[in-house]
Swiss-Prot record:
Its EC number is 2.4.1.184. This is Beta-glucosidase-like SFR2, chloroplastic. Belongs to the glycosyl hydrolase 1 family. Residues 123-132 have a biased composition (Polar residues). It holds the Pfam family Glyco_hydro_1. GO terms for cellular component: chloroplast outer membrane. GO terms for biological process: carbohydrate metabolic process. Rice SFR2 is able to rescue freezing tolerance phenotype in Arabidopsis sfr2 mutant. It comes from Oryza sativa subsp. japonica (Rice). Keywords: Chloroplast, Glycoprotein, Glycosidase, Glycosyltransferase, Hydrolase, Membrane, Plastid, Plastid outer membrane, Transferase. The active site is at 303 (proton donor), 466 (nucleophile). GO terms for molecular function: beta-D-fucosidase activity; beta-galactosidase activity; beta-glucosidase activity; galactolipid galactosyltransferase activity. Residues 116-140 are annotated as: Disordered. InterPro entries: Glyco_hydro_1 (IPR001360), Glyco_hydro_1_AS (IPR018120), Glycoside_hydrolase_SF (IPR017853).
Length: 647
């Protein structure tokens, strides 16, 4: 065949393949949109006042009328708040990536970094960056895009090219940690829990979620006699703190594993190894035997799939350090992802049985899991498969494996993630938290409905075990609280049994690999002034909702109007996520934030409008058919002060 003819034939074949691929992806998106992106018909009457009254719905079948009430709470974790804690996170934060000569260490052939924020808001790997660095400074980092990246919501595998210079190129595992006062003291919850407990109680909440750190109780691997490896004084201190929670009139929700693996377990492989189940059960028995009469709700594992992804698949958290082969094969049936989750599921089942067999409470213990869920959607036509595959790995598998050992399913929800290629897209006209999580209250409603449909045959109730937003300005947080509570209320109206709602968190604290950058607290903390606390306006708004059980039209309107005025005035606020020239967010935090404007968009519950796919091809097709569309192109957002339009 002559060369011109061969080239022409190859070109025709390429066009046919491209057309077929486009058609297939378009069909997939059409199905996905019908199932997941249709406008929510809100069951809330927005002309009513109050808009929501949580006291109108019983949360349980208990005989005690007090137990029938929907409960509000606040949540935290040992690694975030406890001082005098020699845990894996402190070791991780104080490590340097440079050797004694100032040369950058490279412990792995490639670093697998997860771009998805996952849990507790700051659950992302630090990019080991200095604040405000220019994207041009990252030119030596070359992304190697592989299939696994899309499967795990934006894994981005990066290899370092070129030689590293010493000195200024040295970096840290945890952002916004080395540049703040007394970072290792966290919030001094160990030495002075009353500072936090008093603030929590004064909001009016009835449930306080806290944790017990495994490494504090078992600082050494129990290879011989268990007693020789246990810090019994620490166990008694935990019992005293839990008693203090109850003395403040709050019930206790106790987490047994919250993203903190003992350093000694990390050395041998942690949850990749069966013996970790045995060690964990030693820890569980210690805690249950000593404090079960003081605990009302138990969370055995917090976000297990997030911990496994970031530790064993990505090597982004302490206790992991996978090699290139482990990274590449991590999501195969025999890979480390399924392997570690398998042992964690077994540990959950054994812990569940032990708690129920040994509980000293008169009433049956309530034991569950805190499961992280994001609402994910595709940015472009060819991102649908990545979203579907990510959900297939993270949405239901772990809960499915333990659903016969659950008294409640805890939902940790922070927002939405827009997937574009190998990472997460920063959508220009969407509002985001400081840590890069898209604000989308409708997503919580969608998730609750979806989970209820899957597990309603088991009659398992739900608890919102975490929901919060990093926002130092407090302008986003106030409507964020109200709109997510309205989403929860709407789900209850639709028949979802939700026992309660816990906000993350009381005071600004250490947010995993993001350090002290993102501000999640209802209370601001002045780290340079002996950790002085100052309640933000959202603290008092949250307290008003908690004490009355109601969301009023006035509160909603005032919170929204204040945020929109800031957007109209083009005010800016801190943003702790680096973004490349294509609008994709880097996986980790910054030591110092960049500034991002508030966004003019109506993201209130039941108001958010999906604009469709935003890749160039989809936009081009939409432009062609726009003259024939009857859909309104202007969405109006109105209240008694502001009226403006968004094209």
């Amino acid at each position: 065949m002559p060369l011109p003819a061969f080239v022409a034939a190859a070109a025709r074949l390429a066009v046919l393949v491209a057309a077929a691929a486009t058609a297939a992806n378009a069909a997939s998106y059409a199905r996905y949109r019908r199932r997941h992106l249709r406008r929510i018909p809100s069951p809330i009457d927005e002309s009513a006042d109050p808009l929501a009254d949580f006291r109108a719905f019983p949360s349980s079948d208990a005989d005690d009328s007090e137990e029938d009430n929907f409960f509000f709470g606040l949540a935290t974790a040992p690694a975030h708040v406890e001082d005098r804690l020699e845990d894996a996170w402190l070791q991780f934060a104080t490590e340097t990536s440079c050797d004694d000569n100032g040369n950058v260490r490279d412990q792995r052939p490639v670093d697998a970094l997860m771009a998805s924020a996952a849990g507790d808001g700051g659950s992302q790997q630090s990019w080991r960056s200095t604040g405000g660095e220019n994207i041009g400074d990252r030119e030596q980092r070359k992304p190697l895009r592989v299939a696994m990246e899309a499967m795990l919501r934006g894994f981005e595998i990066l290899a370092e090219s070129g030689e590293s210079a010493g000195g200024d190129n040295c970096s840290h595992n945890v952002a916004a940690w080395h540049n703040v006062p007394c970072p290792q003291e966290r919030l001094r919850f160990w030495s002075d829990p009353d500072a936090e407990l008093k603030l929590a109680k004064e909001t009016g909440i009835s449930v306080f979620r806290m944790g017990v750190d495994w490494a504090r109780l078992m600082p050494e691997e129990p290879t011989e006699e268990l007693k020789s490896s246990v810090n019994f004084a620490a166990l008694e201190r935990y019992r005293w703190i839990i008693q203090r929670v109850r003395e403040y009139g709050m019930k206790v929700m106790l987490t047994l594993f919250h993203h903190s693996l003992p350093p000694w377990a990390g050395k041998y492989g942690g949850w990749k190894m069966e013996k970790t189940v045995t060690y964990f059960m030693d820890f569980v028995r210690l805690v249950v035997d000593r404090v079960s009469n003081l605990v009302d709700y138990w969370v055995i594992f917090n976000e297990p799939h997030v911990f496994v992804m970031l530790t064993y698949c990505a090597g982004a958290w302490p206790g992991g350090d996978p090699n290139a082969i482990e990274v590449a094969t991590s999501t195969l049936p025999t890979g480390v992802y399924n392997q570690a989750l398998h042992w964690m599921a077994i540990a959950h089942s054994e812990a569940y049985d032990y708690i129920h067999s040994k509980s000293k409470n008169e009433r049956k213990p309530i034991v569950g899991v805190a499961h992280h869920v994001s609402f994910t959607r595709p940015y472009g036509l060819f991102d649908v498969a990545a979203v579907a595959l990510a959900n297939s790995l993270t949405l239901f598998p772990y809960v499915d494996s333990i659903c016969d050992k659950l008294d409640f399913i805890g939902i940790n929800y922070y927002g939405q993630e827009v997937i574009s290629g190998p990472g997460l897209k920063l959508v220009d006209n969407d509002e985001y938290s400081e840590s890069g999580r898209g604000v989308y209250p409708d997503g919580l409603f969608r998730i609750l409905i979806q989970f209820n449909e899957r597990y309603k045959r088991l009659n398992i109730p739900f608890v919102i075990t975490e929901n919060g937003v990093s926002d130092e300005t407090d302008l986003i947080r106030k409507p964020y609280i109200l709109e997510h509570l309205l989403a929860t209320y709407a789900a209850i109206i639709m028949g979802v049994r939700v026992l309660g709602y816990l906000f993350w968190t009381t005071s600004d604290n250490w947010e995993w690999a993001d350090g002290y950058g993102p501000k999640f607290g209802l209370v601001a903390v002045d780290r340079a002034n002996n950790l002085a606390r100052k309640p933000r306006p959202s603290y008092f708004l949250f307290s008003r909702v908690v004490t009355t059980g109601k969301i009023t039209r006035q509160d909603r309107m005032s919170a929204w109007r204040e945020l929109q005025q800031a957007a109209v005035q083009k005010k800016t606020r801190p943003f702790f996520r680096a973004v490349d020239k294509h609008g994709r967010m880097y996986a980790g935090g910054l030591d110092r934030p960049i500034q991002r404007p508030f966004i003019l968009r109506d993201w209130r519950f039941g108001h958010y409008k999906m604009e469709g796919l935003q890749d160039p091809l989809s936009c081009f097709i939409r432009c062609i058919f726009a003259p024939f569309s009857r859909q309104k192109k202007i969405h109006y957002i109105e209240d008694d002060v502001i009226s403006y339009s968004i094209n």
